[in-house]
Amino acid sequence: MIALITEKPSVAKDIARIIGATQRNDGYLSGNGYMVTWAFGHLIQLAMPEAYGVANFRRESLPILPPDFQLIPRQVKAEKGYKADPGVLKQLKLIKEVFDQCDRIIVATDAGREGELIFRYIFHYLNCRKPFAVSYTHLTLPTILLV
């Protein structure tokens, strides 16, 4: 089984149609030896300054250069501070399940730095060790499947 991950659901649906992954599931499409899942923008972000021991953050605190940067699920405002976005947590769980069932991953996020970052943050956050290849060009079967 091969996983494909896109930056947004609309692209995932287009790719799934092209490769014959027509079975709809919660958070992904499957079929014909493929599982196609998606992010919806930046699901993972760098931790806030407080996570690195910087209290009462001010401009004078910059730059913040911790020994290791922490990746966390996208945050939303809560009553007191911020909390992980429940929709993001759900999709991350589904992406992990897809990755766990597959032998390799084809990255079909948008071309450029942002698309690359969206995938790599997810990949590292999930501690995934599967091999992956990047397909950034056109929505044609040979380029999607890296044939």
Question: Where on the chain are the PLM-derived regions?
Answer:
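Single conserved hydrophobic/aromatic residue that forms the stacking wall/gate
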Residues: 138-147
